[in-house]
Amino acid sequence: RYLHLMPEQEAITNMQSILQRKGIEGISPIAREVKCAAVPTQKNVVLIFMESMSANLMEHFGSTKKLTPFLDSLYLESLSFDHFYSAGIHTNHGMYATLYSFPAIMKRNAMKGAVVPVYSGLPTVLKDNGYRNLFFMTHESQYDNMNAFLRTNGFDEIYAQENYPKDKVVNSFGVQDDFLYQYALPILNKRAEERQPFFTILLSISNHPSYVIPDYFKPHSTKLEDQIVEYADWAIRQFMQEARKQPWFENTIFVLLGDRKSVV
């Protein structure tokens, strides 16, 4: 029921000894400052957390079902990694690890608590360097205490189910992936016009039960679990095709990763 952890100060002392650093006061006891010689280019960054997306679903990694033709095509023309592992089995684990560089801790949701913890991570570093940080999710912003946690830890704007038309909500997890992506584009266009670099998170949901296949998408698979992967891939394709038409596209880095691995 409970994790057996060593005392916090002992863990900090051990890590400082191993890393040979004293940390940075007010940021982290094991942080180090990195100074770049070159002037930062300040490209926009769009990071897409793909719900439960795993390598075993892609043709490149051995799947014969042809569920992810677009992701497979991106893999061949992008900077890609064969041994990349998402953290934990819950979305909050993957977000926490990816954005704030902490490992997932079993049986704990680091985003919840009576007092919202303050962390240094990718969002806060980018914000300190002049970025506008936006987060788009399909469901209610209070889910997993995301709204309070993200606003406390570097995000300026959060868009969630309460911002979307009620007729676009399809289940308890909110709107479809392709609607989320369509909704985000005009907002990103406005931010680009302000000539301030932006860091944007898009958190998808489609590949999470209960699965909802929109009427306007026609999958070739017969199993619902496969159809939803086809839809998720198609929705990403639609977003990237539209993003490619925008003036900010060439100055933007797109990062796609699975938020976590679904329990098998």
Positions of PLM-derived features:
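Soluble catalytic regions of membrane-associated enzymes that act on cell-envelope
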Residues: 1-264
